[in-house]
A protein has these predicted regions:
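Non-catalytic beta/alpha edge segments that cap or flank active sites
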Residues: 1-78
């Protein structure tokens, strides 16, 4: 149930697809997430596909968590 008395606040979301086989043309899960985010009137200006390497995943998430313009990080794949 949505509480209508609370004003809407747009959040900025980063989507990270973790895959060794996908690119921006073939990443269906990333595309779905971005579409759903925008349909709910939130922002997704940060989208990246990274390799399925644990060190790279940790590094990327740490970097994005330090970005003051990103409120939420969503990962898919892996």
């Amino acid at each position: 149930m949505i509480n209508e008395s609370i004003p809407f606040k747009q959040i900025n979301i980063s989507v990270i697809t973790i895959s060794d086989t996908r690119n921006k043309d073939t990443d269906k899960s990333g595309a779905y997430l971005i579409k759903a985010i925008k349909e709910k009137k939130h922002s997704c200006e940060d989208y990246e596909i990274i390799s399925d390497d644990p060190n790279n995943i940790i590094k990327t998430i740490k970097e994005k968590s330090l970005n003051k313009n990103i409120d939420v990080i969503i990962t898919t794949g892996g």
